[in-house]
Amino acid sequence: MTSKIIVALDYEKEEEALCLVDQIDPSLCRLKVGKEMFTTLGTKFVKALHDRNFDVFLDLKFHDIPNTVARAVRSAADLGVWMVDLHASGGLRMMEEAKKILEPYGKDAPLLISVTVLTSMEDLDLLQIGINASPMEQVIRLANLTQRAGLDGVVCSPQEVEILRANCGKDFKLITPGIRPIGSDFGDQRRVMTPAGAIQAGSDYLVIGRPITQADNPAEVLKSINASLPVNR
């Protein structure tokens, strides 16, 4: 598996999601399962995706006391997911305990990444929750904390990639939502970029939802996006 595309499965019903999944090739993408689908369908849905040979990013953004988050991360590892995330704003100790609990899994441990600042948030949104910093400043602060905790990477907007690469180095994974092929609607994302632009900026993985899942021919759109990506990244 070398694809940089993670398809976001944002559906209300299992049959709708599996209809899409059965149209696309697991060698061309991974799949993201978020709060809505996981709350409704649970672990059996993740297992159904695994049975179809897809790697799964379990996007539940854990944020709780350290012991609770660590146990949740361990449950994700037992489920066999490829990647799982938590909120960096939960603090250093929370992230360190989550990372430590994965040690017994060795090379089979999922990638553990953090969410810094949601891509829907702008300066005013941060100010309204008491953070007197720009999204970029807060992202850098939380990405540095994430790296200090030993996690594998962060979710970040494409506009933040270059500065995070400079701050965190080439081995720190950068997972980028807010990806919209040319001509797509921005939806609820505020900081967006095309797939090729994000890879050129230094993203490792691109999270793409509606441009693929709502396409008339999802398989062809997925192939087209993969073909558009720079080959030297």
Curated annotation (Swiss-Prot):
GO molecular function, one term: orotidine-5'-phosphate decarboxylase activity
EC nos: 4.1.1.23
Pathway entry: Pyrimidine metabolism; UMP biosynthesis via de novo pathway; UMP from orotate: step 2/2
Coiled coil: none
Top class in the EC scheme: lyase
Pfam families (alphabetical): OMPdecase
Binding residue positions for substrate: 10, 32, 59-68, 119, 180, 189, 209-210
Keywords from the named record: Decarboxylase, Lyase, Pyrimidine biosynthesis
Active-site residues, as the UniProt record annotates them: 61 (proton donor)
SUPFAM superfamilies attached to this UniProt entry: Ribulose-phoshate binding barrel
GO biological process: 'de novo' pyrimidine nucleobase biosynthetic process; 'de novo' UMP biosynthetic process
Described purpose of this protein according to its UniProt entry: Catalyzes the decarboxylation of orotidine 5'-monophosphate (OMP) to uridine 5'-monophosphate (UMP).
Entry similarity comment: Belongs to the OMP decarboxylase family. Type 1 subfamily.
Name listed for the protein in its UniProt record: Orotidine 5'-phosphate decarboxylase
Annotated source species: Pasteurella multocida (strain Pm70)
